[in-house]
Structures are given as C-alpha cells and as structure tokens.
C-alpha cells in the first residue's frame, strides 16, 4: 500500500465515507478491515490465565510480615500457594465424552436405479441358462452397479481423505483448545506432496500457539469472513506480522512491511467455501472460578497450619531449672529439670482441622457437580469393577448432560466439515471425479466407553427375524462385519449358488437321475 493510498484512506475515514470490508482490503487498509472483525484473542488470553495453575489468584498471595513487640518488621515469611488444576481435569473429561472415540461417518446417498436393479435381479434368477435375455440383463446390471460403485468409491475417498489428514486427532485438539480459550479453528489447506499430487492438511489455530483468530458472522450466524494473524521471522531475523483473510470467493495474504505498510496478495479461493471450521463455546469450568479460588485458599491455609505444627515444640508448665544447659537444635537432649509440680510436653493440635477439611470436601463436590464433571477417583473406578455400558452411562450422567449440550453445536460443525471436505475433493483434490458434493453424508457421535455391541446385535437379530429390519441393515449393525456391502454381495452369491443347486437337483429328479 502506497503512502498516497494511506492518506486517501485516512481522508475517507475522516469524512465518514464507509468502505466495505473488501474495499478496505483491496486498498491495503488492513488495520481497519481487521477492526471490523471480532477479535477472539483478547478473551482467549484471559481464559488461558484462568486455565494455567501458575497464574491462579492464589499464586499472588503476599508473604506474611513478622514483627517484634514494638511493631518493627523482623522478616517476611513465605506462605503456601497451592494451585489446583481443576480446569485441566474438567476440560479433559469433557473432551473424552465428546471425542473420546472418533465420530462415525455414514453414507446415506440414495443409490441410483435401485428398484430397477432389484427387478432385473429377480428376472435374472427365473431365466434359464442360454436365454439371450440374460446377456442384456447382465449388461444393464453392470451399468447400474458401476453408478452405485462410483458413489461408494467417492464415500470411501472422503473417509480416506479425512484419515490421511488425521481429522480425528485434530478435532480432539480443536475441542480441547475451545474448552480452554472459548474459540479455536480448524484450517483446511491444500498443498502438493513429494510426488506433485494435491493433498489436504488441517491446522488447529489457538492463542496458546500464538495464533490470533478474527471472525465475522452475519445475522444468521453464517461465517462471512475469517482472518488468521501470526508472526514469522525473515532472513534478516526480523519479525514479520501476517494476516491471512479468507472469504468464500477470495483469499488475501497480507504481510506488514517496515513503516506499517502492507503488501497484499489476492488469490482465488478455488474451494468455493471458507476453509475453516470455527469452534465457539464457554470455558468448561464456567461459573466455578470463585469456588476454585476458595478451595485453593483453604488448602493453602491448611498447609500453613500444618507447617506451623510440623516441627515439635515444647511446653513447660514451670520454670526449667537447667535451661542454661539445654541442648542446641542439632544436639540430643535427655533431661529437663523443672520446679516441683511442673511438666514439660510437646505442643499438640486439638482441633484436627476438621471444619476446614469438611469445607474443602464440600467445595470439591460443588466444583465438579456444577461443571457437570464426574469424580473419577481411583476408589470410584475400583468400585465400578466390571460394570456394563448401561451402568457406566448412569454413573457418568453429569458428563453426558454436558456432552449432549455440546452436541447441539458440534453436530453443525461436523456437518460443515463433510460439506467442506466434499468441496475440496470436487474443486482441488479429485477434479476428474467430481460429484462428491452430491453425497449425502451423516454422522454419529461415538460413546466414550464403547457401546454394548452384543446387546445391540441381539436386539437387531430379533427385529430382523420379526420382519422389521432388512438383512443389509442387520449387517450394518453387526460388529463382526467390517464392510456390510461386501458381505451382502457374498450372501447374494451364496443364494444364487444355492438356487442353482436346487434347480439342478429338480432337473435330475425329473429325469430320475437324483439319488
């Protein structure tokens, strides 16, 4: 951006001229363009301070000043500062109940000419060998099968693309960061691999990794623009600030030069969508900060009290006659001589600090329950023993309540992911085989501790036997079968072979050949 453009932009702003977001970027006025967006990094920095134990309020506890009888300062004594990583524990438990196991992707695309295929299969079965109609039917079936295989192959390519990009690991990372910073983003970008083939990669953006996130949503909560701020170091060892700004039609790479001016490089967004999934939520330990502060203060005070009584202290009820010859700290003492009727004993605690311990236990319960977090102590887990999946569900009801609340948003995030990845496959990764955006892809959240698969299969068999479920659906619910489509083809072949054997036996029986 030239000096002339800088002056022009300043004059326009001074006279109240409203430039659009894209006009500001095109004119090189990146600062004003970024100011039109919501800066997520400020709030993220505040949340990180609450998350990290070393920056908790208790860590600012002032030392105790020790004074003499006249009020003069003798020394200062450091007090205990016990910070408890409740946010870490609460966030990790919430993460496990959302993405402890990867989400399941399912292909619900209607298979083309399915009814026609079924009619041809039935007609094919009743025709005798040698009938010229068989060749025509086989050709039609092969054509229909090719169309259906293209859909299946596209869906498999979709799943392979996510697997190669390590989506399951990245979505966990993005959820973990969002639970800490209240906002994170998965940035999908494409590059060429060592063989020159296009490939998709995912980068999780977070303030803890020095990324600044800026968003612009419309009134319907649709993402209109996204900006990523970051720093690099040039060849002269100077820090260079960057903004990558994404819209559905364009991508701008902005680099700040010396003097504050910007170099702006615009490129077409070939994907056709903003290649970002933004995760937004409240911190997982929301509204428990005051309880956490109180627990940390109580435990620190208890530790101070324990320190005061940890070293033995003598109490004499009369004058010690041989006090001039008392042993030094490093020496052993054997005898104290006191006046008649006197006594010497160690100072002992009488309160046992029960009230404070009770308070800490109650606060701990409140923190976990109000953040919808189960108390997964070793004792509690031992008590569960060989619990079934249903029993674990009841025990983890608080975590499931929170997970169900998160799924209201994450259901949309996963739907956006499938739409975005299909657009990337159509427009960048696999252009010759376009058609991925026509796929109907659904998803399911997996149970964190796995499902009671044997019970599910038993119920599915009962429903199938009663006529309420197709064989194909039964195969899809079986944990013993990896590919329901392949297994269905095998069953069809077995049925055809069985039918042929029956026809052959009937012919042999008609001629009196069968034994």
Predicted ranges, named:
Residues 1-200, 515:
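Extended, helix-rich architectural segments
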Residues 44, 165-169, 178-185, 298-316, ...:
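Short secondary-structure junctions and interdomain/linker hinges
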Residues 149, 161-165, 173-174, 279-289, ...:
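Generic amphipathic alpha-helical segments used as scaffolds and interaction surfaces in large
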Residues 172-280:
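Extended, regular secondary-structure scaffolds
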Residues 260-393:
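Extended, charged amphipathic alpha-helical segments
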Residues 323, 330-331, 339, 355, ...:
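C-terminal helix-loop subdomains that flank or include functional centers
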């Amino acid at each position: 951006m030239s000096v002339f453009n800088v002056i022009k932009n300043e004059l326009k702003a001074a006279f109240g001229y409203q430039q659009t977001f894209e006009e500001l970027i095109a004119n090189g006025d990146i600062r004003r363009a970024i100011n039109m967006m919501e800066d997520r990094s400020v709030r993220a920095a505040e949340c990180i301070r609450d998350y990290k134990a070393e920056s908790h309020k208790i860590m600012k506890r002032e030392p105790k000043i020790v004074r003499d009888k006249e009020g003069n300062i003798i020394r200062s004594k450091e007090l205990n500062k016990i910070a408890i990583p409740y946010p870490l524990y609460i966030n990790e438990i919430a993460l496990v109940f959302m993405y402890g196991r990867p989400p399941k992707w399912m292909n619900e695309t209607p298979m083309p000419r399915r009814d026609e295929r079924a009619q041809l299969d039935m007609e094919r079965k009743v025709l005798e060998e040698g009938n010229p109609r068989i060749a025509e039917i086989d050709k039609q079936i092969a054509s229909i099968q090719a169309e259906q295989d293209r859909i299946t192959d596209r869906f498999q390519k979709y799943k392979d693309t996510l697997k190669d990009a390590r989506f399951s690991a990245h979505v966990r990372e993005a959820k973990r960061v969002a639970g800490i910073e209240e906002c994170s983003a998965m940035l999908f970008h494409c590059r060429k691999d060592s063989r020159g083939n296009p490939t998709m990669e995912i980068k999780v953006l977070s303030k803890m990794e020095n990324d600044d996130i800026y968003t612009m949503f419309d009134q319907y909560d649709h993402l209109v623009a996204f900006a990523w701020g970051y720093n690099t170091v040039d060849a002269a060892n100077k820090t260079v600030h960057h903004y990558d700004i994404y819209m559905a039609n364009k991508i701008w790479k902005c680099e700040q030069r010396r003097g504050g001016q910007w170099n702006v490089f615009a490129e077409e967004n070939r994907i056709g969508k903003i290649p970002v999934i933004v995760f937004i939520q409240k911190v997982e330990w929301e509204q428990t900060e005051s309880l956490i502060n109180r627990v940390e203060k109580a435990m620190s005070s208890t530790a101070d009290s324990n320190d005061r009584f940890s070293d033995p202290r003598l109490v004499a009820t009369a004058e010690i006659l041989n006090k001039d010859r008392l042993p030094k700290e490093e020496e052993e003492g054997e005898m104290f001589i006191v006046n008649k009727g006197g006594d010497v004993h160690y100072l002992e605690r009488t309160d046992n600090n029960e009230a404070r311990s009770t308070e800490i236990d109650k606060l701990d319960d409140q923190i976990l329950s109000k953040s919808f977090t189960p108390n997964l102590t070793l004792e509690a887990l031992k008590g569960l023993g060989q619990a079934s999946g249903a029993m674990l569900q009841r025990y983890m009801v608080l975590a499931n309540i929170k997970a169900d609340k998160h799924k209201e948003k994450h259901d949309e995030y996963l739907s956006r992911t499938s739409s975005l990845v299909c657009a990337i496959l159509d427009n960048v990764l696999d252009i010759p085989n376009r058609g991925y955006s026509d796929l109907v892809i659904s998803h399911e959240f997996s149970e964190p501790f796995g499902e009671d698969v044997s019970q599910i299969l038993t119920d599915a068999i009962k429903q199938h036997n009663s006529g309420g479920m197709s064989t194909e659906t039964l195969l899809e619910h079986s944990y013993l079968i990896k590919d329901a489509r392949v297994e269905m083809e095998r069953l069809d072949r077995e049925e055809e072979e069985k039918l042929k054997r029956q026809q052959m036996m009937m012919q042999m029986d008609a001629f009196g050949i069968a034994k």
